[in-house]
């Protein structure tokens, strides 16, 4: 009867085979693990993209604030330079005007301090090699006293924040004299 009962078990499909059931469950576990890994990878990717977007937006917001400050301060450059020029003549004026000039000079220094705090610095150009990124050549001067391309005069100061100019210097640049032709060759 044991033989017939064993045959009966293998022949009866309604009774589950434990080995097949374990295999099916292991297959289902493997499939679920793969799906979980895929979903987790997607989640981590979306999380990283979200963090990158947040950082990018924060950086853009800081840059916009910096540009707004720069633009506001740039508007003060011309009046400040005018004040510097006017104060340059104070030594030729009366004592009363000199006292006023002293006060205006203090105000001018406060403006310059604000510029420095915001990272805006003026740069010197005379004696430097012409750099189109930092300078605007408004004049050239033929000379043999300095090499070609060297700045010989500055008409307006240049200002920058870090390495980025916010206003280029207006300058006069040295130029080699044109070769002079002999009068004989002209005839």
Curated annotation (Swiss-Prot):
GO terms for cellular component: cytoplasm. Its main location: cytoplasm. The keyword Cytoplasm applies. Residues 1-11 have a biased composition (Basic and acidic residues). Residues 1-23 are annotated as: Disordered. PROSITE patterns: GRPE. It comes from the Bacteria. One of its GO terms (molecular function) is adenyl-nucleotide exchange factor activity. Keywords: Chaperone, Cytoplasm, Stress response. One of its GO terms (biological process) is protein folding. This is Protein GrpE. Disulfide bonds: none annotated. HAMAP family: GrpE. InterPro entries: GrpE, GrpE_coiled_coil, GrpE_head. Belongs to the GrpE family. It is found in: Cytoplasm. Pfam families: GrpE. Participates actively in the response to hyperosmotic and heat shock by preventing the aggregation of stress-denatured proteins, in association with DnaK and GrpE. It is the nucleotide exchange factor for DnaK and may function as a thermosensor. Unfolded proteins bind initially to DnaJ; upon interaction with the DnaJ-bound protein, DnaK hydrolyzes its bound ATP, resulting in the formation of a stable complex. GrpE releases ADP from DnaK; ATP binding to DnaK triggers the release of the substrate protein, thus completing the reaction cycle. The gene is grpE. Gene3D superfamilies: 3.90.20.20, Head domain of nucleotide exchange factor GrpE. Homodimer.
């Amino acid at each position: 009867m044991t033989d017939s009962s064993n045959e009966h078990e293998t022949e009866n499909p309604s009774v589950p085979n434990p080995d097949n059931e374990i295999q099916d469950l292991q297959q289902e576990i493997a499939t679920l693990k793969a799906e979980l890994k895929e979903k987790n990878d997607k989640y981590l990717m979306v999380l990283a993209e979200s963090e990158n977007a947040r950082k990018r937006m924060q950086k853009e917001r800081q840059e916009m604030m910096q540009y707004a400050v720069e633009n506001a301060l740039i508007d003060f450059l011309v009046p400040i330079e005018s004040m510097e020029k006017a104060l340059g003549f104070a030594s030729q004026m009366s004592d009363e005007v000199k006292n006023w000039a002293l006060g205006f000079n203090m105000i001018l220094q406060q403006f310059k301090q604000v510029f420095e705090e915001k990272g805006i610095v003026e740069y010197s150009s005379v004696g430097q090699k012409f750099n189109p990124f930092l300078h605007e050549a408004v004049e050239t001067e033929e000379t043999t006293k300095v090499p070609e391309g060297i700045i010989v005069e500055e008409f307006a100061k240049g200002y920058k924040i870090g390495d980025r100019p916010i206003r280029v210097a207006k300058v006069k640049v040295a130029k080699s004299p044109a070769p002079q032709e002999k009068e004989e060759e002209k005839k």
